[in-house]
Swiss-Prot record:
Function of the protein: Binds to 23S rRNA. Forms part of two intersubunit bridges in the 70S ribosome.
Name of this protein: Large ribosomal subunit protein uL14
GO cellular component labels: cytosolic large ribosomal subunit
NCBIfam families (UniProt xref): rplN_bact (TIGR01067)
Bilayer-crossing regions: none
Top-level taxonomic group: Bacteria
MF GO annotations: large ribosomal subunit rRNA binding; structural constituent of ribosome
Disulfide pattern: none
The keyword Transmembrane helix is annotated on this UniProt entry: no
Subunit structure, interactors included: Part of the 50S ribosomal subunit. Forms a cluster with proteins L3 and L19. In the 70S ribosome, L14 and L19 interact and together make contacts with the 16S rRNA in bridges B5 and B8.
Length: 122
């Protein structure tokens, strides 16, 4: 589960490398975010010459979590890291490539562009 102050790896080529979560979107008292949820974050480290700069406030969708997600069939999916993809206001990714696998739950969340760019959907 991702909460305020959680650090996330960036799984796209937007130029950001690491994010710090500021807020979980979806209600004033919402504390945690899982796979497919949107967070507001700040860029803590960025690649030189990238589209985003250090200190910039961005929106991101969670694509991998260590705590994982429970599936309707009773199985769980867990990853080795917490990762997110930077998005625009219309839910399209800011980068043009996605690195690493993403969870199938993004398909139900309406992030078809991210799912189609990902090398593997688990």
């Amino acid at each position: 589960m991702i909460q305020t102050e959680s650090r996330l790896k960036v799984a796209d080529n937007s130029g950001a490398k690491e994010l710090l979560t500021i807020r979980v979107l979806g209600g004033s008292s919402r504390k945690f975010a899982g796979i497919g949820d949107i967070v507001v974050a700040t860029v803590k480290s960025a690649a030189p010459g990238g589209a985003v700069k250090k200190g910039e406030v961005v929106k991101a969708v969670i694509v991998r979590t260590k705590s994982g997600a429970k599936r309707p069939d009773g199985s769980y999916i867990k990853f080795d890291e917490n990762a997110a993809v930077l998005i625009r206001d219309d839910k399209t990714p800011r980068g043009t490539r996605i690195f690493g696998p993403v969870a199938r739950e993004l398909r139900e969340g309406g992030y078809m562009k991210i799912v189609s760019l990902a090398p593997e959907v688990l």
